[in-house]
Amino acid sequence: MTEKNTTIQNVRAVTRALAILNSFAGKNLQSLAEVTLGTGLDKGTTRRLLLTLMDSGFIMQDPATQHYRLGRAIRDLAANVADDLDLKAIALPVMTELAADLHITAFISVYDEGDTVCLDRIHDMKGIEVHWWAIGGTLPYNCGGAPKLLLAYQPPQEITRVLKRPMVAMTPKSVMDVTEFRDQLEKIRRRGWECAVDDVALGLTALAVPVLDRNGDVVCCISMAGLTPQMVSRGRPVHLARLQAAAEQIERRLKQ
């Protein structure tokens, strides 16, 4: 095979791979048949290219449904386009207002390969200092509202991978049983929020909700923390509606 022919084949492969990635525009999950239909490629070529893209992290596959979705490599590249999507700049004013109104500590956090990273926090708990989660810091995946919520929204294979890591007991209330924790994650995903009581620090409760993009994927988590009597009443989170409204406000701004 000549060098010219090799170059042509390589260009064709790249073009086809890009067609597969572009077929996910506006779509969260696709079957093999849907990708084939969307690209006009034959099934064998589509399958081979999907496997190659999976190896590179550009595509992920749900083992339960065998459907495909965009992978973390796409999100990592997108994260570098700061001018197009400055998440912190959009979310911070909303969370600052929330913290000032309710006198709580508000957090903006993102998922990163099994860790939940605090992008920013706004502290307005009068007379009370909170130091457990610094900006840029992480929390154990089994403790706190944001870590559990963000993990609950990950694909099943990612949850399984993370659960191979040791759990950490920050307080006696921290969940340390894998089966119990899996059940907790399923419940969080179904209801769309998490209220974590006393599992990071005794006497403190965190409430967390997701911020979703137009495809229903999690962009970040916004959460608030305060004294348990301030956050929970009769077993229910007091400020859930307010936090969900803040998430919806951020979602609208992200879509503009």
Language model features with spans:
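N-terminal helix-turn-helix
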Residues: M1-A89, T96, E248-Q256
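Short, structured helix-loop boundary elements
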Residues: N10-V14, H67, G71, D84, ...
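Short, conserved catalytic or interaction motifs in soluble domains
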Residues: G26, D124, D213
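Amphipathic alpha-helical effector-binding/dimerization core
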Residues: T65-R165
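Short, solvent-exposed cationic patches
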Residues: Y141-G144, R234-Q256
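Cysteine/selenocysteine-centered motifs that mediate thiol-based redox chemistry or coordinate metal-sulfur cofactors
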Residues: L151, E158-L163, A169, A247-Q256
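Extended hydrophobic
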Residues: K173-A246
